[in-house]
């Protein structure tokens, strides 16, 4: 079938949050209608997504760990990096809130209380951008959560959805991006307990896998995707994605001067 042979597609290694939140189901048909290019997503934690791209198994990377992204660029694996959008992280926990942190805007103080009381906490433990952020906050709190591993601190080794399922089943606290939380249906008794701390800002970046490292990378098609995401149309499409009236991601691409 000639139509199949001629189909234009790229592989996008991306975070589970952009997939689990439903953002890609909203964006990708719009991009395809605009360009004729099918973007096929491999949804993994940020660490795994960057590893996939490093091997040349993706054309574009769309992730949220600024430090890991910069390292990827510095090592020559990524080019054309642009900041696309942001949302924020929140801490969720059982409505009974045994640690009494509900309504707090202090993520560090909340984590200290969780650790001091040894209240159950579920972590992704999967080298994702969300996991990396969670570990940064534990470090800022002066706590090594690994000391609680096997007792109050439990790593699922999986994506945000399964980790929230585990937290819901255990009545545990968890750290999540707001986008996945808003689209997550199986909340049980879980509610947001900590939000609004400026430290919880969560930036997403997109970049092309460097064709100088992997000549088979579809750089022209990949750049079209990046250009669309950062265009007025793409940015408006990101802003338009809502669940129950709540915007999940906020476009913030700024053209380099």
Report residues per predicted region.
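Exported/periplasmic ABC-transporter solute-binding proteins
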Residues: 5-43, 47, 51-57, 66, ...
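Acidic, polar ligand-binding/catalytic clefts
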Residues: 60-86
